[in-house]
Each structure stands twice: as C-alpha cells, then as structure tokens.
Amino acid sequence: METVDTSERLTRLRQLMQERKVDVYIVPSEDSHQSEYIAPCDGRREFISGFSGSAGTAIISMTKAALSTDGRYFNQASKQLDSNWALLKRGVEGFPTWQEWTTEQAEGGKVVGVDPALVTPAGARSLSETLKKNGSSLVGVEQNLVDLVWGKDRPAPPREAVRVHPAQYAGKSFQEKISDLRKELENKKAAGIVISMLDEIAWLFNLRGTDIPYNPVFFSYALITPTTVDLYVDEDKLTPEVKAHLGQDVVIKPYDSIFADAKALSEARKQDATGAAPKFLLSNKASWALSLSLGGEEQVEEVRSPIADAKAIKNDVELAGMRSCHVRDGAALIEYFAWLENELINKKTTLDEVDAADKLEQIRSKHDLYAGLSFDTISSTGPNGAVIHYKPEKGSCSIIDPTAIYLCDSGAQYLDGTTDVTRTFHFGNPTDLEKKAFTLVLKGLISIDTAVFPKGTSGFALDALARQFLWKEGLDYLHGTGHGIGSYLNVHEGPMGIGTRVQYTEVPIAAGNVISDEPGFYEDGKFGIRIENVIMAREVQTTHKFGEKPWLGFEHVTTAPLGRNLINATLLSEDELKWVNEYHAEVWEKTHRFFENDDYTRSWLQRETQPISK
C-alpha cells in the first residue's frame, strides 16, 4: 500500500474551488447511481486522496483536507494518506464526523460545494440544515471539480455489451416483475417511479452487464409508469438479442436524457390545474441531482425502493441456484486450500498473497457457469489479516508465512448465483490465543446459523447473537455481521442485513433473504480471524407459535471446511460440537465427488472433515 503525493492535485482543486467561489468541497466515494463498487472513471475520492478503500468521504477546504472512513479501513487509510490529509475515524470517540468537520471548516458564512449527482437528497438536506445554523450554505456544483483536475488521465466510461439473464436462472420474467411493480405504484397512488440503482435495473429487466468490476450491472436509468417503460442506456451496448428480449413495450432512450425527461415531467405536473397530480416515487438512495430534476421534495416521494425489497426475496429458482453454485464454489475452495497447504508445507514453495489469490481465481474459473469474481480476493497472511478489507498488490504484498494464520475472503459470480466466503486457516501450529479467538468467532457464526426468531425480527436484533461470546471476553469487531447477497448480482445488497446500522432496524429478515454470516476478530499487527458462510432465511416449524405468526431460521449454503486445527473443542457446547461435525459431514457429502481423480485433495478434504471431540 503506497502513499500517493496529492499536493499538486489539491492545489489544482483549490484553484477551481476559488474560481467557483466554493470554500469547502466534498468528494464522496459513490458514483451518480450511489454504487458501492464503482467503475474506474468514477474513482474520484481515490484520485484526490490516494486512499483506495471502498468507503469514505473526502473534504477539502482552502487550507486543510480530511478523509473519513470506517473501522474496516483505519489501518489502510493511515498507510495510504499523505501528510496533506487528516484521518477521521468514523464512530471513534474524539474524532468528528465528516459533517461536523465540514461545518467547522465552513464557519462564518462560507460556501460548501458538492456534485449533486453523488449525494442523496436526504444527505444534502441534512448537511444544508446543519450548515445554515452557522450561516453557511450548501450548493450543488454540477461540473465535477475532481474530473477537471483529473483531465485526460481520467479513464473512459465503460462501453461493454449488455446481456440477457435467462429465465432459467432469473426464475421470473421481467414483464411479471414490472407488473408487480405497477401494483405497488397503484397502492401508493404514484404517477410512476424513476430507478437509478444499477442492480435494481439489471434485476428488473433480467439483464446483466460488465460496467463495474465484479458487479454484473450496466450504466442506466429507468422510468416506469402505469402505461410506459423507458430504459435509459447507451443503445450501442444493446445486442439484437437484448433488443428482442425487451420487445416493443420497452422504449430505449439515451442514457443522459433522463434528466431532461425528469424536468419535463416536473413541468407537466406543475401545469396540473387541480394541484392534486400524483407524485413520482424516487428511491431514498437516488441522487440529489435526479430529485432536483423531478422538482425536488414537493413533487417527489422519497421511499425505500420497492424494487430493492422485491429483489431481496429470492424466488425458488434463485434459491436453488444459490445452493448449486455454492457447492461448486466450495469444491473450488477445497481444491485451493489443499493446494496451498501442499505448496507451503510439503513443497516449501515461496508464494506471495497475490500468487495465491490468482491460483484461487484460476481454480474457480474451471467450474460450470463461472462468470468472474464477485469482489477483490482478500488473501492475507499474519498481520495483514487484521486489515479488514486488505487488498494485496503485486510487488508490495507479503510472502505467505506457513507458521502464521492465513485469512482468505473471496467470492465469485456464477450465472446461477453469487458467492462470498471467508475461511481462516493455520497450516502449522496455532497458539492457544489464536485457537481461542477462532473458536469464539465460530461460536458466533453458529449462533446466527441456528437462530430461530419470529417473523418481523430485524438483523439489528440478531447481531448481538454473533458477538456475545467475544463480548464476554471484552472483545468485538468493527464491521457488520451480515449483508444481503444478490443472485448473479452485487455481492453486497440491501435493504436488510445483520449489524448495528440504524437501517437494519427498519427492515425485518424475511423468508427468501440471502445473507452473509461473518463474525470476526482482529489483533492489530498480529492476525485476523473471520469465518463467513452464506445463509438463506426460511420458515421453520416450532413447537409453539406465539402470536400465531410464522417463525424463521436459516439454511447455510456455503460448503467448505472450517479450519479444524484452529478449533478448541473444549470451548464448544455439545450442541455446537454437534453442529461442527454435522457441517463437516455435509461438506464431505456434497463435494467429495469433485475429487474422484484427485487423491491428494480428496484425502485433504477427508482429514479436514473428520469429526472432532472434546
């Protein structure tokens, strides 16, 4: 992880700020679709700050610069930021939020600027109200100033072809999905809905793309009314197959024309003499720029996207695909970890973290329906495992130490599903502390996996189950316990999840949700432990049914051994020990057929799935 000298970039940015009479400028991580993962052309925050993590906000005043990020990235940011930058540790006492820092820099009637395409209306309103209290103001700066600094070196926007996602994997036609959406519009008495989240558009139309690394989406907007369907996308990306799939009912319009069309809709609504024209729905994650084009608060109803809610509840075909792809993915992981142990221990091969990650990708790519990785593989040895979202890079990454803990968080895209799995192994002799920490984390994973709870329970409520064993020791981890996972879509999706985010209190876990279960523990400078399975919520039978409501539990689909020599069986209850042994028996049963002609991997798998006892 190298530090980038940002002095020249900041000088140029401040010149542009001065020309536009902006005193403080905000650079969010997101693109104009509020995407978590972004295309290289949208990496503005990384370009201006040098920090390459996926989450964070940069704020630049005329004399200072600050970068705010969360606990996953404190170590990484401290290494990558140069002396021009202050690191604001989100959620840590003594550090201001980026909003507080911005307000402090803007005291005395100063102007704060931001590209309105990169923030939500709610975010803009909240900051604007805070700034007003000290006489300052927030303005939208439509021409992105970082783009001007970047100039001709900025990567070109992607122009790859869009593909049809067949019904055999989608499980439902796009016409049915739009029909369901129109029922929602009718229920809300809405004029229509403008959609800007890329995974929602890909899911709704049963299309996939490659515009953003690891996320099979394409740059687009959509406008759905009770009688029309408009898809805003660069038509050059649409193959004859895609056009035939969409048919005559979907009108294709230029990508950028959404803003002009939104303004026209807003003007038409203003002309309504009755003053009672229905509003358009807009996701509360859409951009401030889109909201302004539609006429702002008065003409738009900001809602949690009904498409996000529908997408999060997988249909039977999608759930079957998830089960199937996780077995193939598990086989790839088994082959990989067996290979890695053989190279490190038996052959004494020198391998760095990237060599190992590349090998895992090569193994995965042999499996049916493979369509690429779902995120950058986190291949980390020893102390690098404590960097929660560590990204190894050739030339600066570490050689894998066979006497240290090795943490690998990885995932893949398959046509029938998306995977995300973390395994922590030690190919030598782990210390008592490492075994204790691993076992406490494992107990948390099992606690979520075996949870039974009434319908209506949120992931916020479940989160403490995963942390309870660490908490008893005065330990914790600085990330969520679980996030939603797409079906051959984004590896991170909402609206539900397991963690302490306020939004998780608002959305209960529902049957059909696919979520990660990933507690961890990190000893800075020494090692990191995380165990992650993908689980699917489903209705379960209980002896009683208090309140006459359905009760839910989980089904795990990840099939890979847990790292047997790191488990301290004396710390497990009888039920937990039974769970581990049954899980390993299931892994063997589902995956050993892949290794009929690979004696080494088969024997490794047999060893790693043997029952353990106290």
Curated annotation (Swiss-Prot):
Note on cofactor: Binds 2 manganese ions per subunit.
Record-level Gene Ontology MF annotations: metal ion binding; metalloaminopeptidase activity
Residues that coordinate or bind Mn(2+) 2: D409, D420, E532
Needed cofactors: Mn(2+)
UniProt EC number: 3.4.11.9
Keyword Metal-binding included in the entry's annotation: yes
Signal peptide limits: none
InterPro entries: Creatin/AminoP/Spt16_N, Creatinase/aminopeptidase-like, Creatinase_N, Pept_M24, Pept_M24B, Peptidase_M24_C, Peptidase_M24B_aminopep-P_CS, X-Pro_aminopeptidase_P
Biological processes per GO annotation: proteolysis
Reactions mediated catalytically: Release of any N-terminal amino acid, including proline, that is linked to proline, even from a dipeptide or tripeptide
Superkingdom to which the source organism belongs: Eukaryota
EC category name: hydrolase
SUPFAM superfamilies in UniProt: Creatinase/aminopeptidase, Creatinase/prolidase N-terminal domain
Listed GO CC annotations: cytoplasm
Residues annotated as binding Mn(2+) 1: D420, E518, E532
Family as reported in the entry's similarity comment: Belongs to the peptidase M24B family.
Function of the molecule: Catalyzes the removal of a penultimate prolyl residue from the N-termini of peptides.
Name of this chain's protein: Probable Xaa-Pro aminopeptidase P
Naturally occurring in which organism (per UniProt): Aspergillus niger (strain ATCC MYA-4892 / CBS 513.88 / FGSC A1513)
Gene name per UniProt: ampp
